[in-house]
A protein has these predicted regions:
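Helix-rich, typically C-terminal accessory recognition domains appended to large enzymatic cores
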Residues: 3-181
Length: 181
C-alpha cells in the first residue's frame, strides 16, 4: 500500500503489465516504479499542454504532413496493440503504448506543434488542434485497461461533453496503417 500511495495505482498497474512474461518472477522495488511514475507525469503534462494551448477544436480539413504522420503512427500502434492483446501479450501491448506516447506523440508531434504555435501558424494549428486532441483521446482509450484512473480523469478534463470511449477509429477518420515510413 505504501508503493501505491507514493507512486500511484496506475504506475503500479502499468509496471506490472509491462513486466509480465511467462515463467518469470517480477522484481518489484521502488526504483523500478520510477519510470512509470514519470510516464504518468508525462501523460498529465501532455494533457495540460493540450488543454491550455489548444482550447478550441479545429476543423478536420487537410492534414499537414505531421498531422498525417501522427495519425499513421497511431494506426500502427492500434494494429500492433490489437494483435498483442489478441495474443495475450500484455507486456508487448503496454510496451507499444509507452513508446508511442513518449517517442512519437510527445518527443515529436507535440514538439513540432509547439513550433507552429510559437510561430503563430494559424492555418496549420487549426487542424493540429483537432488531431492532437483526437489522437490523445484515442490513446487514452487504449491506455484505459492499464491506467484507468488517469485515463478517466483526463477524459473528464478534455472531453466534458464527449463520450470518446464509445467511438471507434472509423468515426475519427483513421484509415489502415501505412508501414512504409
Amino acid at each position: 500500500l505504501d508503493l501505491i500511495e507514493e507512486y500511484g495505482t496506475d504506475s503500479l498497474r502499468l509496471f506490472l503489465s509491462s513486466n509480465i512474461s511467462p515463467h518469470s518472477d517480477i522484481k518489484l522495488s521502488p526504483n523500478s516504479l520510477d519510470p512509470y511514475k514519470n510516464f504518468m507525469n508525462k501523460i498529465w503534462n501532455a494533457a495540460k499542454f493540450i488543454n491550455l494551448n489548444f482550447e478550441s477544436e479545429g476543423n478536420s480539413k487537410e492534414d499537414s504532413f505531421f498531422d498525417a504522420w501522427i495519425c499513421n503512427e497511431f494506426n500502427i500502434l492500434l494494429d500492433n496493440y490489437s494483435q498483442h492483446i489478441e495474443n495475450c501479450e500484455v507486456e508487448k501491448a503496454s510496451y507499444e503504448l509507452y513508446h508511442f506516447f513518449w517517442d512519437d506523440f510527445c518527443d515529436w508531434y507535440i514538439e513540432i506543434a509547439k513550433i507552429s504555435y510559437l510561430n503563430n501558424k494559424d492555418d496549420e494549428l487549426l487542424n493540429t488542434k483537432f488531431r492532437m486532441k483526437q489522437v490523445f483521446c484515442m490513446y487514452l482509450n487504449l491506455l484505459y485497461p492499464f491506467a484507468p484512473f488517469i485515463s478517466l480523469e483526463l477524459h473528464d478534463v478534455l472531453n466534458k461533453d464527449s463520450k470518446f470511449f464509445n467511438k471507434s477509429r472509423e468515426l475519427y477518420g483513421f484509415n489502415s496503417a501505412k508501414q512504409d515510413h
